[in-house]
Amino acid sequence: MLVAGSLPAIAQTTEKTNDMDRIELCKENYTALFGGEALNGGGTDPEIMDILQKYIFGEVFRTGDLDIKTREMITCVCLATMQQLPQLKGHTGAALNVGVTPIELREAVYQCAPIIGFPKVLNAMTAVNEAFTERGIKVPLETQATVTEENRYEKGHEIQYPLYGDRMKEAMKDVPGGMGEKVARFLTEVHFGDFQTRSGLDTQTRELLTYCVLTVIGAEPQLHAHLRANLKAGNSKERVTAAVIQCMPYIGFPAALKALNIIKDFQPED
């Protein structure tokens, strides 16, 4: 699904992780991600670090069929959405350590822009670019744009329509002043034309990450629509469920449970 190179040998297969206790798995995943040692008793709050490390890296990381690269990209879009910039910088390094490319990570954060707004994405990219620079990665990265001024609507609509139909156009038709048509066009041009058409990540991955961003902000109507789109894009309900669970330690149980209930209760005709 992702544009990527080979992964390091880390604990991510179901067969292997099912045979490991959570402490062993936590230590292995943590070292692969951050290069240090988990559960070392250091710092000012070793107890909460012990709890969160075992929970995230020893339990959540073996829940569902997601590779470790996808898990780290999900973590990064959660942190970008919540504007937790120091943690985002740290997880940028972790993502690079497990094989996420700079282009993939940048595209994952860019994908948040139509949902959380451009200022937050610019803030997030400051943290990401700091991590890149410290690793000797030259910025700006290579362009991934694939559309022109002339075809951005057409190319965006080619992605949007099979996944969402004309629901947004219909929903906006009664906006005062006839401006709903403009809003629907903006969505097609910006979300799908300017972002979804970009190279670096495929539509299936972008839809999964988008669902995670919507989970963070609790956008219930959009969670319904984007679940349907995820299934059309090739993600299973089980995969989307695993992605939401990956968000859970960072966003808390209530927001994650809202998204999980939507997945659980979804019917194809919804």
Language model features with spans:
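Short, structured motif recognition centered on aromatic/hydrophobic residues
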Residues: 70-79, 108-109, 205-214, 243-247
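Electropositive phosphate-/nucleotide-binding environments in soluble metabolic enzymes
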Residues: 20, 24, 46, 85, ...
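Short, glycine/charged-rich beta-strand-loop motifs at protein surfaces that mediate ligand recognition
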Residues: 198-199, 212-217
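Extended intrinsically disordered, low-complexity coil regions enriched in Ser, Thr, Gly, Ala
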Residues: 67, 83-106, 119-132, 218-242, ...
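A short structural micro-motif
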Residues: 80, 98, 111-118, 215, ...
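Bacterial Sec-dependent N-terminal signal peptides
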Residues: 1-13
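Acidic, glycine/proline-rich low-complexity segments that act as flexible tails and inter-domain linkers
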Residues: 12-68, 121-203, 232, 249, ...
